Amino acid sequence: MRVNITLECTSCKERNYLTNKNKRNNPDRLEKQKYCPRERKVTLHRETK
């Protein structure tokens, strides 16, 4: 079952990316290193509800 999720920057709290994930394979919150346009650098982005 794939669900749509939003990735939020951990340092500036801006929601920058929309993606999807398979809840059966990844039940935990997703964390990825992504580019933050506000800070102009790569930061950790976490899944939000």
From Swiss-Prot:
Pfam families: Ribosomal_L33
Keywords in alphabetical order: Ribonucleoprotein, Ribosomal protein
GO biological process: translation
Keyword Ribonucleoprotein: yes
PANTHER family: 50S RIBOSOMAL PROTEIN L33, CHLOROPLASTIC, LARGE RIBOSOMAL SUBUNIT PROTEIN BL33C
Stated family: Belongs to the bacterial ribosomal protein bL33 family.
Protein known as: Large ribosomal subunit protein bL33C
Organism whose genome encodes this protein: Enterococcus faecalis (strain ATCC 700802 / V583)
Taxonomic lineage of the native organism: Bacteria, Bacillati, Bacillota, Bacilli, Lactobacillales
Protein's gene: rpmG3
